[in-house]
């Protein structure tokens, strides 16, 4: 990707995470609907910008004036959340393009992940966006939040149960919205807060690397946690991992699609090409990232990195109970190339 394209993508990420005005297409009084719950969360956490509910069949939504279209608002809109059925997304994109929207967050599904017909519609939406200079997060995602802007467009039960966004130093970037929600719930149980969290879904436009690069440059983010199904630009991804290591920001990764069956599941989930796991593992470890097995370990390690100083090297002692734990520890730590110094001047203590 050319530097000018990367710069444009990073500007779009910054706009998405710190918008001045948001339109909610599909806004509803019903909290069981996406347009209802996400509008409620925007208000609940005290977003300081302008919020415009868009619903042509209502005058008021959640006590706020509703607009028949984005164009009818007549004011600049940075981000438009599209929470309408798939068959209405093309008209919604044309409306946003005519209104000069900068970034679209599309939570609607049934696009490239569902087959050729959905992929063709996704391509048409991307063409509309490119003609208008709009950028897309999604589709088939669950949204995002930025705790330091008190702004949430993430549909999550963990957020619905909390009175505030817990500010923290972990940037969470996930292709899976469901796993992002599960990690968020577990992290909140541990008292771990996030700088920002984003669910990317199909990555039709903005992708993992764009948000990873933003996290490296973001003063609020000290630890970066990733759930990755497929990477669009492998060379850029590995280069960013090296940059994160040089910046002193640990990158923790859960990688889906480790087996052939897992790769098929990934394709049907977010239309990602998972790639061969061993090659991925070798490259990311060499670049300084930490691969973990599941989202519970990802949250636990992120919590540890925010609370403990980074080690200065690979040498370090391990304390454990006698027996199996002590004999298994060297094998477990060998995968991360931890070296155990031999103890000196040690004497058994009589019992």
List the predicted regions and their residue ranges.
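Catalytic-core regions of core metabolic enzymes
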Residues: 1-311, 315
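Residue-level recognition of specific faces of alpha-helices
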Residues: 50, 103, 328-329, 339-342
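Short acidic, glycine/serine/threonine-rich helix-capping segments at coil-helix boundaries
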Residues: 342-351
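Primarily a LysM-type cell-wall glycan-binding module
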Residues: 312-339
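Internal amphipathic alpha-helical segments of the cytochrome P450 catalytic fold
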Residues: 180, 234, 326-327, 337, ...
């Amino acid at each position: 990707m050319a530097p000018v394209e990367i710069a444009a993508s990073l500007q779009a990420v910054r706009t998405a995470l710190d918008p001045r005005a948001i339109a909610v297409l599909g806004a509803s009084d019903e909290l069981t609907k996406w347009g209802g719950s996400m509008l409620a969360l925007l208000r609940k956490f005290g977003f300081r910008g302008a919020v415009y509910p868009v619903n042509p069949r209502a005058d008021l939504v959640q006590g706020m004036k509703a607009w028949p279209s984005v164009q009818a608002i007549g004011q600049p809109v940075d981000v438009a959340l599209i929470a309408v059925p798939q068959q209405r997304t093309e008209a919604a994109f044309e409306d946003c393009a005519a209104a000069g929207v900068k970034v679209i967050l599309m939570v609607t599904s049934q696009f490239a992940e569902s087959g050729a017909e959905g992929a063709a519609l996704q391509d048409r939406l991307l063409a509309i966006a490119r003609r208008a200079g709009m950028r897309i997060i999604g589709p088939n995602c669950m949204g995002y939040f930025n705790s330091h802007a008190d702004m949430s467009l993430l549909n999550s039960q963990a957020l619905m149960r909390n009175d505030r966004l817990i500010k923290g130093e972990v940037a969470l970037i996930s292709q899976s919205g469901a796993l992002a929600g599960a990690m968020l719930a577990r992290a909140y149980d541990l008292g771990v807060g996030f700088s920002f969290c984003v669910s990317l879904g199909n990555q039709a436009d903005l992708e993992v690397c764009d948000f990873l690069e933003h996290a490296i440059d973001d003063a609020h983010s000290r630890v970066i946690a990733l759930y990755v199904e497929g990477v669009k630009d492998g060379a850029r991804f590995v280069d960013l991992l090296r940059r994160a290591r040089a910046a002193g920001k640990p990158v923790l990764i859960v990688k889906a699609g480790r087996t052939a069956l897992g790769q098929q599941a990934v394709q049907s989930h977010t239309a990602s090409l998972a790639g061969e796991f061993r090659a991925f593992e070798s490259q990311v470890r060499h670049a300084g990232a930490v691969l973990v097995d599941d989202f519970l370990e990802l949250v636990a390690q992120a919590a540890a990195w925010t609370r403990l100083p980074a080690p200065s090297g690979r040498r370090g002692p391990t304390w454990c109970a006698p027996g199996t734990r002590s004999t298994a520890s060297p094998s477990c730590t060998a995968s991360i190339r931890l070296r155990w110094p031999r103890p000196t001047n040690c004497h058994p203590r009589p019992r």
